[in-house]
């Protein structure tokens, strides 16, 4: 899979989770990308990258767990190899994995049925009103699409922002 996270909000973590190889094009200023990958359980993945900003620099490789203190300081491309990639979507995430706050989450079993009925595709754009955990899981299922999460309460919006950050999502817009 090839993703370019310089132009549109793309989710690196779910893409790496579900593909054996992911080529990521990125720009400077992403300070915690490797920490986020490691935090999502992808520390054993191997990263192949060019050392430095010149195209003729040496190609190096390291495991994500050895790069958690590094960031991206130049436009770059990197190949991430995940030998444990899954080829199915994960739905029905347990409520214990979501950040707590003012939100009452629907049960994971009910959420799994709702998401199954929605038949979300990778490039879908979806609007979710007052369904925080559904918005998060939809964003994971549609890493190349956009999820608009409508939250009426300021405290619910804050919790939603925490969950977006916690899951490393770039394709959620909260209004």
Label each residue range with its predicted role.
Residues 132-144:
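Conserved SAM-binding loop of SAM-dependent methyltransferases across substrates and taxa
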Residues 107-122:
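Conserved alpha-helix/loop element of class I SAM-dependent methyltransferases that forms part
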Residues 17-101:
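A contiguous loop/helix-start segment that scaffolds small-molecule binding in enzyme catalytic cores
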Residues 150-175:
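S-adenosyl-L-methionine
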Residues 19, 122-123, 144:
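Phosphate-coordination loops involved in phosphoryl transfer and adenosine-cofactor binding
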Residues 1-18:
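Class I SAM-dependent methyltransferase SAM-binding "motif I" and its flanking Rossmann-like core
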Residues 123-132:
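Conserved class I S-adenosyl-L-methionine
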Residues 50, 129, 148-151:
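The conserved SAM/SAH-binding core of class I Rossmann-like methyltransferase domains
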